[in-house]
Amino acid sequence: MGKLQDGIAIKRINDAITTFKNYKLGELEQGGSMAINTLSNVRAHVGLAWPAILRNCLIHTSSHLGFMKFMIDIATTWKVGAFTLLGSVGDEDPFTDVDLIYTKTCLHLGLKDNDFLQFPEEFAYEANSFLEAQSMNARVDMLTGVHNIEDKYVFRMQSISKFLKAYYTASEDVAYLTGFIKPDDSKDSILSAELLKAQVTSEVLRVRNLITTKIQKYINLYEDSQLPHFRQAALSYTQDWDVDGGVPAALPQPDTTDDENPVANPGPSAPTVSKGADQPEDEEMIRKKVETSKDGPPKAVPSGNVSARGFPAFLEDDMSEMDAPDGFHDYLTREHENNFDLTQLGLAPSV
């Protein structure tokens, strides 16, 4: 594959950031989605750098919301091959320094190159481990792998569920997410920082609500499915999320008119959300506070947190593919065996 020149490398990451900035929930369900096609194209050209690019998109404020919608889509889609979008292509890394190129891309797009979320160390470790593991384990051989795609689907959904739950747990207190804000003493800078804080807080609350409602809908749809892979995934979600007990419960969330149309009436056991004390302040309230405030800049992030850009390198899958239960291949239908429709499967080519 060789190393990419900076211009081409920036173009690849540019496409990923821009796609996640504009990503809408449900893109995976659409045939010929431009967003999914673009991400597939980027994935096909960045080799082993794919998990690092996804990690940067997770932690940068501009792409965080879109990336999490993308993960929710994969976790709850009926397309059993969609998880392959997390797998890398090939065995080479065409980037000399992914983080440096990502920074250059942010500047090229007019984004701040230091607006990265600072997650707690434990979640940073888990997130990096997850993305690195999926880079290898979400691959599917196009010649032989499609015949056991449902087996891998169950394992990947269990892994993704654990990632979403780790995110949900880590974001119970959203205050730490704004530790990256370091404004100067000017009122304009403080106002800008406060607005960004409100935006990030709102996005995290929205993601938390989307996770619970979409997981609940998936369970309602597939817990009694005649197809074992859907039924097994739904059972795993039920065990991870304890939806019947209402745990975990979603944080209060402001009313929003969202283009992704979150699930309506997910069921009596679904966690509920309402407006409350944690609702982000609007711009006018923030402006008034800044004008009258005599305090200095916001406090720095606690020492217990570490920058997510300092993720420890870790490559270890969270689930062994060797533990697949017996009999999983028996439910393959004749159509699956003789005429695979890769578009319907949502399968991303690995080569």
Curated annotation (Swiss-Prot):
Q: Where in the cell is it found?
A: Virion; Host cytoplasm
One Pfam family from the record: Phyto_Pns9_10
Ranges where the record places region Disordered: 245-310
Q: Which UniProt keywords apply?
A: Capsid protein, Host cytoplasm, Outer capsid protein, Virion
Q: Does the keyword Cytoplasm apply?
A: no
Q: Which InterPro entries match?
A: Phyto_Pns9_10
* Bias type Basic and acidic residues, positions: 285-297
Q: Listed GO cellular component terms?
A: host cell cytoplasm; viral outer capsid
The role this protein plays is: Minor outer capsid protein.
Q: Which family does it belong to?
A: Belongs to the phytoreovirus minor outer capsid protein P9 family.
Q: What is this protein called?
A: Minor outer capsid protein P9
Species of origin reads: Rice dwarf virus (isolate Akita) (RDV)
Its taxonomic placement starts with: Viruses, Riboviria, Orthornavirae, Duplornaviricota, Resentoviricetes
